[in-house]
């Protein structure tokens, strides 16, 4: 399942993303974040982390640096929008 999800993300990044342009307010981009989250945490938790990130990426978000939490950390300790906004690009 992990391989399928990463393949879908690669397809999105190569085929769809160039048509839409760069709109992500965070670093790394949401698609890169999702790929890393799935690689580090597996399909289920990685998808959950990616979905949380997508919910934070909107026009009213300040954005900033939001890295995937380390594999042994709790997702509740991940940087939130308020913390990420203090690390603007």
From Swiss-Prot:
Residues 68-89 are annotated as: Disordered. The keyword Membrane applies. Its main location: membrane. It is found in: Cell inner membrane. Residues 77-89 have a biased composition (Basic and acidic residues). It is a peripheral membrane protein. GO terms for cellular component: plasma membrane. SMART domains: Haemolytic. Keywords: Cell inner membrane, Cell membrane, Membrane. Could be involved in insertion of integral membrane proteins into the membrane. Belongs to the UPF0161 family. This is Putative membrane protein insertion efficiency factor. It comes from Burkholderia thailandensis (strain ATCC 700388 / DSM 13276 / CCUG 48851 / CIP 106301 / E264).
